[in-house]
Amino acid sequence: MKDFTIYSALPSDMKLDRERSKEITGYASIDKPWLKYYTEEAATKELPKKTFYRYAKDNNKYNMEMNVFRYYGFKTTYRKFFDMIDKAANSFAALGVKKGDIVTICSPTFPETIIANYALNKIGAVANNIDPRTNAKRIEENLNKVNSKYLIALDIAFPKINSIIRNTNVKMVVCN
């Protein structure tokens, strides 16, 4: 067989399409399919080295009197939002939650769920969110897979939680 050289028809400064330039693994965290919607600048921009709690607080220090969200007539300012996050973070710490702990939250996206996510991020814990409509077996599998030690659950999910909690490493359940 004769040796040969392959020449590309693309100019040397042209980059290949990100979608076609690598093999698809099937893992979103590796394949990053969302990048196809990003500009090159946005896709390669370095992320800030801070928690999303700190990022949100730093980027809204001049917006403290503006509304952060409205939910069924309930409005709150950034100042009150960050105060609620701080109180929730202190409460989690008082319960024994510490940096690196995984806290599962089985609740829809209520304002309280958002506050809990930010509070856990503030203290360095990891929020693992589960849809409360998930069946008991899947909740059990998820709790065991991530080795969650704490569980916050919507009260209507308690019957499901109660049926599986002894099969997990969860040491504290809080129903709201």
Q: Each PLM stretch: what is its role?
A:
Residues 29-36, 53-77:
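AMP-dependent adenylate-forming
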Residues 124:
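Structured binding elements
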Residues 1-49:
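Flexible, non-catalytic linker and terminal segments flanking ANL/adenylate-forming cores
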